Amino acid sequence: MTDIFTQLDGVEFSARAIDIDTGYEVFSHQPDRVLSTASIAKIFLLHAALRMREAGELRLEERLTRTAAERVHESGLWYLLDQPDFTVHDIGMLIGAFSDNYATNVLISRIGLDRVAEEVAALGYTDSALHDFLRWPRPAGAPARLSSGTASELSDYMARLSLDELFDSSTSEIMRRWLGAGADTSMVASYFEPDPLAHYYYTRGEWIVNKTGTDDTVRADTGIAFTRQRRVAYAVFANWEAGTDRVLEVMPLMRAAGGLISDHLHA
């Protein structure tokens, strides 16, 4: 089952997929290897926001106003919009749907990286983290990467989210809805061929909720895939050397991982 993750010299994978209800391991390859995960750890920022909501420290209706210092382009929509403020709920949706960098920075300013780190530690995770704001160019002394993590910890998070172990059921649904709006279905999720812009429902009997991360040397995808009978939590991360372009080789393997998950869902 791990053969697909050993096919490319110079590419490191961390991968794991488990049946949420039985614990059966669908596949596993270096699940505890720590890799750069690009935007994946924005999940922990959203998690911290919901934990603060539970503690009465944050309301989803609270409006946050962006500043010029938080502005960053590339992924997302907010930098293209005139609207200067959004509710925390809508900022979460921008992050979940489009991995919005501007929205991420605004929410980090409200919550704080230290609080995110505390919530990650409370989850019991030691190898996964959101390290910094989105910045470009990255200044001297800033963390070298936005986030890092292991397939073991992120697949565990997704399993716990599916089981409503992280929050009460209504709060879990907020998180799942944020992530379920994700428009990037190009990696593991591509095997299921969902409509990238609207797939919070069963498509050909399968449902996918996921978050991705993309950088010059990173492709990462973690999520939940399920039918009416089975549920699988997964994480597949790939890193390669700077100055090389391995995307066209890596992406078919990410899709193949989705095929292994689908095979289990329908076994």
Which residue stretches match the model-derived regions?
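Short, glycine/proline-biased beta-turn/loop segments that scaffold the active-site neighborhood
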Residues: 55-81
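Mid-domain, small-residue-enriched loop/turn segments at the edges of structured enzyme/sensor domains
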Residues: 10-13, 108-163
